[in-house]
Swiss-Prot record:
Pfam families: Ribosomal_S9. Belongs to the universal ribosomal protein uS9 family. It comes from Xanthobacter autotrophicus (strain ATCC BAA-1158 / Py2). One of its GO terms (biological process) is translation. This is Small ribosomal subunit protein uS9. Signal peptide: none annotated. InterPro entries: Ribosomal_Su5_D2-typ_SF, Ribosomal_uS9, Ribosomal_uS9_bac/plastid, Ribosomal_uS9_CS, Ribsml_uS5_D2-typ_fold_subgr. The keyword Ribosomal protein applies. The lineage of its organism: Bacteria, Pseudomonadati, Pseudomonadota, Alphaproteobacteria, Hyphomicrobiales.
Length: 160
């Protein structure tokens, strides 16, 4: 009986050693100009983002961030990935964004910056993932249904 237990233990140890795969190795992905490129999405907005080492300048659609996003809340939203990664003022960001409204566009830029930072510095993936910046927010507007006023709102009901 002891021999059977020893052989089963050995079998279990062998299976555990064989089954455990190595963690995926994330490598740096840069273009020929030394920039990391990523696309970010939020609602109907799509942002194409390029990140490179610099002074912290953010340019959106050839305009400065203060001009494009006048609301301070949206500017704070865009800087969140840098704060989570402790890299404020170390990267320049150039992005083009289209579709959706300003809030969706800010979310798309934030998503793109987060992905581009992980391409530039793969070790930043863990803190950004923990902050929820890499995961795409899949919530989109629910479509309007026929026979209803809006997506869920019914027309006013009259009993008589």
């Amino acid at each position: 009986m002891a021999e059977v237990l020893q052989s089963l233990d050995a079998l279990g140890a062998a299976n555990v050693a064989a089954v455990q795969p190595d963690a995926p190795v994330h490598v740096q992905k840069l273009d020929k100009y030394g920039r990391a490129y990523a696309t970010g999405k939020r609602k109907n907005a799509v942002a194409r983002v390029w990140v490179r080492p610099g002074t912290g300048k953010v340019t959106i659609n050839d305009r400065d961030i203060e001009v494009y996003f006048a609301r301070p809340v949206l500017r704070l939203m865009i800087n969140q990935p840098f704060q989570a990664a402790a890299r404020e003022g170390q990267y320049d960001v150039v992005c083009t964004v289209s579709g959706g409204g300003l809030s969706g566009q800010a979310g798309a830029v934030r998503h793109g910056i987060s992905k581009a930072l992980t391409y530039y510095e793969p070790e930043l993936r863990s803190p950004l993932k923990k902050g929820g910046f890499i995961t795409r927010d899949s919530r989109v507007v629910e479509r309007k249904k026929y026979g209803r006023a809006k997506a869920r709102r019914s027309f006013q009901f009259s009993k008589r």
